[in-house]
């Protein structure tokens, strides 16, 4: 599983002009599921997302986590993160999980997040989404499980 997290001042996801998920200050996380990923990987990734220290403390150092600042968590599925881009000029998606597995693992991540964190929003799996964000920093990290 790959998770591209971005610290945001605000973010929202629209599908067909309708807002399906939005947060204020927090993390926008694009999630790509790979064939070897399962529930254990989802749990490990959620722990990282909630506890990774990307927010500034009183001295401006990145010492505070999403859980510490009680920020929003916007999870958006993005199978293109799992693409193989090592050769050629066209990405190969054979390294991404099949859609049914990708959806199951992503939904498990969302379910765990909603139990563990008070502010969770999502995009819509498999939909053509427009993601709007106010990038804070910018601060962006690629996490893998």
Swiss-Prot record:
EC number of this enzyme: 3.1.1.96
Keyword vocabulary terms for this entry: Cytoplasm, Hydrolase, RNA-binding, tRNA-binding
The record's listing under InterPro entries reads: Daa-tRNA_deacyls_DTD, DTD-like_sf
Q: Name one GO biological process term.
A: D-amino acid catabolic process
Entry GO MF terms: D-tyrosyl-tRNA(Tyr) deacylase activity; Gly-tRNA(Ala) deacylase activity; Ser(Gly)-tRNA(Ala) hydrolase activity; tRNA binding
Cell location: Cytoplasm
Keyword set includes Glycoprotein: no
Task: State the GO CC annotations.
Answer: cytoplasm
**Top enzyme class:** hydrolase
Give the family from UniProt. Belongs to the DTD family.
This molecule's function is given as: An aminoacyl-tRNA editing enzyme that deacylates mischarged D-aminoacyl-tRNAs. Also deacylates mischarged glycyl-tRNA(Ala), protecting cells against glycine mischarging by AlaRS. Acts via tRNA-based rather than protein-based catalysis; rejects L-amino acids rather than detecting D-amino acids in the active site. By recycling D-aminoacyl-tRNA to D-amino acids and free tRNA molecules, this enzyme counteracts the toxicity associated with the formation of D-aminoacyl-tRNA entities in vivo and helps enforce protein L-homochirality.
Which HAMAP family would you find in this protein's record? Deacylase_Dtd (MF_00518)
Q: What is known of its domains?
A: A Gly-cisPro motif from one monomer fits into the active site of the other monomer to allow specific chiral rejection of L-amino acids.
Assembly state and interactors?
Homodimer.
The entry's protein name is: D-aminoacyl-tRNA deacylase
Q: Report which gene this protein is encoded by.
A: dtd
């Amino acid at each position: 599983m790959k998770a591209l997290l971005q610290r945001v001042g605000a973010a929202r996801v629209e599908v067909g002009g309708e807002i399906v998920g939005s947060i204020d200050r927090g993390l926008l996380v694009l999630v790509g599921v790979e064939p070897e990923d399962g529930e254990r990987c989802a749990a490990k990734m959620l722990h990282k997302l909630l506890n990774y220290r990307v927010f500034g403390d009183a001295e401006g150092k990145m010492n505070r986590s999403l859980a510490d600042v009680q920020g929003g968590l916007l999870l958006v599925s993005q199978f293109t993160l799992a693409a193989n881009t090592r050769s050629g000029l066209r990405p190969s998606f054979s390294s991404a999980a099949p859609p049914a597995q990708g959806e199951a693992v992503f939904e498990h991540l969302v379910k765990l997040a909603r139990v563990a964190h008070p502010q969770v929003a999502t995009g819509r799996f498999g939909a053509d989404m427009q993601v709007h964000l106010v990038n804070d920093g910018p601060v962006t990290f690629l996490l893998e499980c």
